């Protein structure tokens, strides 16, 4: 799996913007396979990370 930030840069799994490992962020992946992390109260979480499945 790879993650792209708002600029399209690949972020490594487990990196600071990896929503699957970041507390307070859940991945919301619709049938298309794309999703944005949902804000769940952790103010340190980025809002512009796209998860790639």
Curated annotation (Swiss-Prot):
Q: Which domain of life is it from?
A: Eukaryota
Please give the residue ranges the record annotates as the region Disordered. 33-53
Q: Which GO terms describe its molecular function?
A: serine-type endopeptidase inhibitor activity
Q: Which family does it belong to?
A: Belongs to the protease inhibitor I3 (leguminous Kunitz-type inhibitor) family.
The entry's other comment says:
The reactive bond is likely to include a lysine residue.
Report the protein's function.
Answer: Inhibits trypsin with a Ki of 0.25 uM. Inhibits the trypsin-like proteases in midguts of larval H.armigera, S.exigua, and P.rapae.
Write the protein's name.
Kunitz-type trypsin inhibitor alpha chain
Organism field: Albizia kalkora
